Regions:
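P-loop (Walker A) phosphate-binding loop of NTP-binding proteins
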Residues: 144
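Conserved lysine of the Walker
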Residues: 149
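Conserved NTP phosphate-binding and transfer environment spanning the P-loop NTPase/kinase superfamily
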Residues: 43-74, 88, 93, 251-366
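Conserved nucleotide-sensing/catalytic segment adjacent to the nucleotide-binding pocket
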Residues: 93, 98, 170-172, 177-227
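Glycine-rich phosphate-binding loop used to anchor ATP phosphates in small-molecule kinases
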Residues: 129, 133, 202-270, 327-342
């Protein structure tokens, strides 16, 4: 699915990521602008690993591109360049060589995680004296708008479905859990579409919990990026797959604060088995966003019924100025306050360079 929506999927109130003085910081004692998820340089009382008395305080193993691509060199890569072109997102220049370098090791790693998860389930069943089929293994893919997370999700789903032990793979995006435009208008939230309060977070949580619990048939709403709204009476049906790939900006958000003291709160991330955060410099993401917007202006935005048709009918420079304003006032704010702080919750972080090529991988230590 090609995303033409200018906003992001979010699942956690912005106030959860602010200090009492409203300056941004997900860490209570950190200066504004410091992300807890920055595994390379976190400004805090313990920013120097020597303060902990250990040589390396990072929860991640860091590998550069060459180190990562050398792993799993014998693993199969059942894709062609034509397959890659069908799967990649608009504006993402990924080719077969990049897939070979990045996704061959990644799918081999995922296959190992899945096998380990199934073995653990088998041992637990033996301990309890019960026999239950394994529940779906859930892989989450998060990251900014325009960073390429949709391409990552599609490639992972396509590759994992080629393995004999996991032939049934479903891909669901969180776009379908946006509230309908009618509801947003009633609540005065159309201008904040894409912010946490514009999502049906309960429905999303119930969907993921049902899938992970092994429900035989679960449905998710369908969102149209052309009309910029939920499609009435249409659903995606998930029927107990081997793997569910869940893609969206909100999938790693922690649970919001409970309204009752001592109340237990669950988040989508509580049901995820393996999570991937696609990372890049915000300036690069902005450029990719504007490039994609201009391409859509001359393609998808021209379609009859397109919510964005007004952009197709104005000069490019005027349209790009509007797109840049959306980036600065909406997407960049969401990235800094809601998305980037979840990076440190991911199992694996894929960092891209300015040319959309993977430059670094961070893998959480077991």
């Amino acid at each position: 699915m090609i995303s033409v929506c200018s906003q992001c999927d979010l699942d956690s109130p912005p106030e959860l990521h602010r200090r009492p003085d409203e300056s941004h910081s997900p860490l209570g004692d950190c200066p504004p602008g410091t992300f807890i998820c920055d595994t390379v340089s976190v400004t805090s009382e313990l920013s120097d690993p020597s303060d902990l008395g250990i040589p390396d305080a990072s929860p991640y193993i860091e590998l550069d591109r060459d180190q990562w691509s050398a792993l799993a060199s014998s693993a199969p890569l059942p894709l062609t360049q034509a397959d890659v072109e069908k799967l990649r997102g608009l504006g993402d220049p990924i080719d077969l060589a990049e897939v070979d370098a990045v996704y061959r090791p990644l799918t081999a790693l995922l296959e190992d995680y899945i096998a380990t998860s199934r073995e653990r389930a088998h041992r637990t069943g033996a301990f309890l004296g019960v026999s239950e089929p394994p529940t779906p293994f859930i892989v989450a893919v998060a990251g900014s708008v325009a960073v390429g997370k949709s391409t990552t999700a599609r490639l992972i789903a396509h590759l994992l479905a080629r393995f004999p032990d996991t032939p049934r793979v479903d891909l669901v995006t969180t776009d379908g859990f946006l509230l309908p435009n009618r509801v947003l208008e009633e609540r005065g939230l159309m201008a904040r579409k894409g912010f946490p309060e514009s999502y049906d977070r309960r429905a999303l949580l119930e969907f993921v919990a049902a899938v992970k619990s092994g429900s035989k048939r679960v449905q998710a709403p369908v969102y149209s990026h052309t009309v910029y709204d939920i499609v009435p009476d249409r659903h995606v049906t998930v029927e107990r797959p081997d793997i569910l790939v869940l893609e969206g900006l909100n999938v790693l958000q922690p649970a919001p604060r409970g309204s009752r003291p001592g109340a237990s709160a669950l988040a989508v991330s509580d049901f995820i088995d393996f999570s991937i955060y696609v990372d890049a410099d915000p300036d690069d993401i902005r450029r990719w966003y504007l490039d994609r917007f201009l391409t859509l202006k001359h393609t998808a935005f021209t379609q009859p019924g397109s919510y964005f048709r007004r952009f197709a009918e104005i000069p490019d420079d005027v349209a790009l100025a509007g797109a840049n304003e959306i980036w600065e006032s909406v997407n960049l704010v969401n990235l800094r306050e809601n998305i980037a702080p979840t990076r440190g919750r991911a199992t694996l972080v894929l960092t891209k360079d300015a040319e959309h090529r993977m430059s670094r991988v961070l893998l959480r230590k077991s």
